[in-house]
Regions:
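Positively charged, polyanion-binding regions of nucleic-acid-associated proteins
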Residues: 1-28, 90-106
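Alpha-helix N-cap/helix-initiation sites
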Residues: 8, 12, 28-32, 54-61, ...
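A short secondary-structure junction motif
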Residues: 18, 42-46, 71
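Residues in the recognition helix of alpha-helical DNA-binding motifs
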Residues: 18, 64, 130-133
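DNA-recognition alpha helix
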Residues: 30-47
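A contiguous pocket-lining binding segment that forms or flanks enzyme active sites
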Residues: 49-84
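Accessory, usually C-terminal, subdomains that scaffold auxiliary metal cofactors
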Residues: 69, 75-158
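Low-complexity, glycine/alanine/valine/leucine- and proline-rich hydrophobic stretches
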Residues: 155-168
């Protein structure tokens, strides 16, 4: 999910502007028509270099909803409309993503607002809440007061982080 979204900006944008918005609106399903409208809006806004034909839009719309189904955000199967499934970020993913952003050189405060958290429906406050909850597992110590956040990191590199997450 994370690496697909990082390598496929269209999938990332679909998640943050369509999927999570639908969840926020209390919708029960997302269909290929929602994905098609998303793509047409992107084309109209000039976000793509070349205008796509209708068959390409249909195929990519199906790809977007299919990816969401593959990652457990939407129900599986070959459907034009799919139910939204309960989805939340898992504790190991929170730890991995926090350390990944840290090792990229992103500061503690900036990390909370990084766009990758939006892939899991989290804004800055939601991210801070999740990090505080997970800090009880001992992967890091987090302190916050107002807008200031300080994290004491326990692991020296991503390999050490992955070993700790895996329990080795």
């Amino acid at each position: 999910h994370l690496f697909t979204a990082r390598s496929q900006p269209m999938y990332r944008d679909f998640l943050t502007s369509v999927y999570w918005q639908a969840c926020s609106d209390g919708r029960l399903s997302i269909g290929n028509d929602d994905a098609s409208r998303f793509l047409l809006r992107a084309l109209d806004d000039g976000q793509m270099v070349k205008r796509w034909n209708e068959s390409t839009i249909r195929r990519v719309s199906s790809y977007l909803t299919g990816c969401c189904a593959d990652y457990g955000l939407l129900e599986p199967g070959a459907r034009r409309i799919r139910r939204i499934l309960p989805y939340g970020i898992m504790p190991p993913v929170i730890v991995y993503l926090a350390y990944d952003l840290h090792f990229q050189g992103i500061g503690d405060n900036s990390m909370l607002s990084h766009e990758d958290w939006g892939l899991y429906g989290l804004d800055r406050d939601g991210t801070l809440d999740e990090l505080k909850r997970i800090s009880r597992d001992g992967h890091f110590i987090i302190q916050s007061a107002g807008d200031a956040v300080r994290i004491a990191w326990k692991y020296a590199n991503i390999e050490e982080t992955c070993r700790a997450i895996a329990g080795r």
